[in-house]
Amino acid sequence: MENGSLFNASEIGDLVKAFSNSLAKAPSVTTANGLNFLPLEEEARNTYPVFHPVLDMIPRVTPEELGHEVGGLTATWKQILTPGGNVLPSVPEGSRNAYINIPTRTTSANYVTLGVDAAVTFESQSAGVGFNDNLGTANLAKLNVLLNLEERMSIFGNSGNASTGNNGFLLAVTNTPTLTLKTGGSIPGATNVSVFLVALTGWGVYNAQNFGANLTAPGIAQQISYTSADGNTVTLAGGTAKISLASNVVTATGGTLAVEVKVAAKPGTFGYAVYIDVTDSTTPLAANAYFAGVYTTSKFIISSIPAAVSGMTSQAASALGNVDYSANPATANTTGDFDGVTTWLAGSTGGLKPAYVVDLAGATFTSDGAGGVAELEAAISNQWNTYQVTPDAILISSDLVPAFQTAMQSSPSGSGAGTLWIRQGTPDNPAMGGSLIQEYKCKFSAFGLSKVLPIRNIPWLPSNTLLAPTFNNPYPAAGDSIPSNFRMVCREGYYGLKFPYISRVHSMGIYVEETLECYVPWAGILLTSVGDLGVA
């Protein structure tokens, strides 16, 4: 003991050294141990889109006869077409005119059942207590999924049943494309290029993005097949036409060329699956053509060869069956599609009274010099001059919003050119960028009054598409017998079911039985393959 200490100097040195060494080692507890407060918000957030503006524009009705609700397999109605086409008004003195003809047509639309199912295990429900109502989440999710799918069906559902009033169509064989070399690409020199095309309906474009992309070799899904909650096999057509014949072969030189693809469009086509062959120099083979993507205009540019084509890793054209899957009629394991708004218009082109269905082949909107869009003005004038009808709304795909707005706010060069300046009307007049076009004035109406058409962006409308339907009665003076041009006839409105327990799973579904009526299918405008601002 030194100076009254319990430890001598040597022992104190050893203690200090040992203590210092312990401080240099890793601490016992850090944030990596996970002993931290978890600031989890009190509920899960629904971070997915739900849009159904077209559904909201169409009235929903229950089928009735003499004031009583009725069922049946179809909604059927008679159309009285233009009477009196066989006479003129002048009659001889003291005589009479010929009897007028009154042509009619019978139209029907099959009821279909749409539905979505969901399941929640008992453990999931009990484990979510205090955080999230998992049953409630599943119920809301299936309703939202049904609304999104029903919206798409209302736009481009296709029964293919053209024999009952031109409601529905089949695309059959895709027309043969033609190729032309263009400058401005990066296709390697001495590359032989040919293509095969598959025309796609609205469902075809959607399915290529959502099912075809998940194939082992990405491409298009000609059929969608899965097992239902009750063990049945559901098989639906993928919205695809038969594949085209091969195009001509072009040979790139110099490494700075691109290939322009053109094909004659068929009504009801919203896109094309493209298969590129860079192997054959004379006679292209489907076995050497590989999926290169989906284009939504009938004229487009291939500026480079995708890696999936040169690497032969995407779907080969030879993998496709030579079958037309462009329509979804009722079959043994599905009630099929009802015909959507665009299908009623496209289907009418096969009859005596066609709607205005025009493919612009990649051409962009142009200004008419008076605040209007020339292509839309031509369509509206045609509808009025031919049938004395006008649209009730302008519905455009998301990609066309800038192009449509630019055309409205631009003027062509020359004496009629003009510039419009708009600024915010506040005392200091700050500059504000951006603009929003919400309405479009129609030059025609049934009563000679000003008619203003709302402009709506429709998220589920296929790209490069403008739809201007007539939703209301276009002929109110003709006896007012048309309640609305389009009506959703609901044999059974939305109903939810919770199924008996066969395991410790809550099983439930939501369904609706309905069909879409159209009394005047020639009243409407459908412009496809409209070039956006990025299309030359």
Task: Please report, for each region that a protein language model flagged, where it lies by residue.
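Sec-exported extracytoplasmic/periplasmic mature domains
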Residues: 143-151
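Short, compositionally biased low-complexity segments
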Residues: 104-122, 342-352
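Disordered, low-complexity "stalk" and linker segments at domain junctions of extracellular
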Residues: 160-352
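Sequence/fold signature of self-assembling virion shell proteins
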Residues: 2-51, 126, 133, 308-389, ...
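Assembly/oligomerization interface modules of large self-assembling protein complexes
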Residues: 33-117
